[in-house]
Amino acid sequence: MLDQKNAQLRLLGHDDLEMVLQWRNHDDIRKCMVISDIITLSDHFAWFERNKNRTDRLFYIFEYQQQPQGYISFVMIPNSTAYEWGFYIKPDAEKGMGQLLGNIALNHAFNKLGLEKVFGQVLSFN
C-alpha cells in the first residue's frame, strides 16, 4: 500500500520538461487529454518559458519515494479566486498512484496554498 509520508510535491523545473513531455505524449495519457495533439519539444519549452514566472499558474512534479510519478497544474480561472487543476501520472505508475497524487495535490492546494475552490474537467471516457 502506498504511504502518504513518502509522497511530496516540488515545483516543475526546466530539467523535468523532457520527462513530463514523454508522459504527456504517451498514447495512454494523450488520449485522455482535452487537447490530444502530440506536443513538440520546442513547443513544450516555449510553453514553459511563457508560464514559469506567472503567479496565476503553478506547476508541480509529484514524487513518491523521491522518484517522479506525475505532473500537476493549478491555473487561476480569470475574474475569479478559483483555480482549475489538471494532472496525470506517468504511464507505468504503480496502481493507486493517481489517487495518492490527488490526495497530496488537493491537500497542498487547500492547506498550503490557501486556495478556496479547485475545479477540474473530466472526460466521460476517462
Give residue spans per PLM region.
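A short, well-structured alpha-helix characteristic of acyl/acetyltransferase catalytic modules
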Residues: 1-38
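Alpha-helical elements of Rossmann-like donor-binding domains used by nucleotide-donor carbohydrate transfer enzymes
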Residues: 19, 43-46, 100, 104
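Acetyl-CoA-dependent GNAT
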Residues: 37-93
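Conserved acetyl-CoA-binding loop-helix of GNAT-fold acetyltransferases
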Residues: 95-109
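C-terminal active-site-capping segments
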Residues: 112
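Short acidic/polar active-site loop segments enriched in Thr and Asp
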Residues: 116
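Conserved beta-strand-loop-alpha-helix junction that forms the acyl-donor binding cleft
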Residues: 119-126
